[in-house]
């Protein structure tokens, strides 16, 4: 059984109802820093009920959680666990990097063995434990997975089901196939956005891509770099309209959706079109090309929660 199959079985065996985390799960879930509000809500509900042990993989994400938990001050790594426990949360915050440092330091090895020798481990960002420590954990009944859900291919996500994918897929995911060299299913993403928006955007992109008559290489480049010069009229027209939209977006200033440094080239490289990038454009669309707005509307399905209002607004303007 491969690592992905094992992880799939793990989530299937430890989920119930809407396939959300079961309270009895004894394990460590490590996320990357770019986790959206929807996933955070899922986590917080369980943190407040002291149901799970949660390990974060970056200080930046903890700061984001700290705001969600309404901590009045910034908590240093050394005080995170204590502070959360005082608030009644059964949570241990420690990054994969610190796990490795701790288990390889003789002075702290005992601490690790006391608290992290059993359970389920999902390591993020490709981090791996020291081989000796890994063997110790396995000897104590631990199951260790180093496969990220964000590295799952599209077929596996479909098998997992939308609820599971929605709950566990990190927002900075780039869906790729097993053969990463081919990058068969790579799609663009935003640095921060909700998974629902990403999912809808992904579906729209696949639908648009699949509706075109393109070669394999053209399909690969369509939403990645778009640097390949093709003979496809449909593809060229799409690129022209996409450039127009990016120009429109790049003129928006002081918007919470555009981080510093989100230049036109950056947004093109990251595939920067989605509801979040258009939300603040609508107030100044009087001079915009109506066909471009219709093009946006075509890319945003109105069947997704949160999209209907935006979709209708685009249609009204167009």
Q: How would you name each of these model-derived features?
A:
Residues 1-2, 6-20, 27:
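Fold-level signature of zinc-dependent metallopeptidase catalytic domains
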Residues 4-12, 33, 38-318:
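Active-site-flanking segments in enzyme catalytic domains
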Residues 18-21, 25, 29-41:
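Generic structural signal for alpha-helix starts
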